[in-house]
């Protein structure tokens, strides 16, 4: 389960583990990086999860206001590199917690009006960044797409675009996480997208929130 829904009522991460662990049948959690790691050492997080009978399913990357001009595709090399470094740190955290995958949603990589960006250069920067992250990561890396928000138009906005990224990045440990609501926002056929991703063993996760 996602921890954020529990943190709305109690901002203490360790208390959230306790609440989730008390629910019968729930034994995996997703954590956001870096926000859920801000107040506790990773060993403390791991110990509390084990105490509550929980395991890490995935680490979800969360990029904040610093990346409002884009994460991987940002035209400023220093900011793009910072985004890559954040993913590397998240991969380390995922591995230490025994997580199954790292999920990357590039909410700020996109544009708000036509011709705002050089689309080809932007694409190439994103592909290069994913290669860097995948080559570093010891865990599977999954792309979660959304058609819009935080930008008017997300760069990786659809199943088709995500699959094209997978093709160009060309790494065995890169796949997709399909969010049911995001697919409906894009007016996609969720079952169709799921079947095509699974056909190539690239379906790394399915979210129904």
Label each residue range with its predicted role.
Residues 51, 55-56, 70-175:
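Active-site acidic/histidine proton-transfer and metal-coordination neighborhood
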Residues 62-65, 107-109, 209:
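Short connector loops/turns at beta-strand edges and beta->alpha or beta->beta junctions
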Residues 6-9, 30-44, 110-112, 149-155, ...:
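Acidic-and-aromatic substrate-binding clefts and catalytic sites of carbohydrate-active enzymes
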Residues 1-95, 171:
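N-terminal pre-domain/capping segments
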Residues 18, 131, 163-164, 191, ...:
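Active-site phosphate/pyrophosphate- and oxyanion-stabilizing loops and adjacent acidic/basic residues
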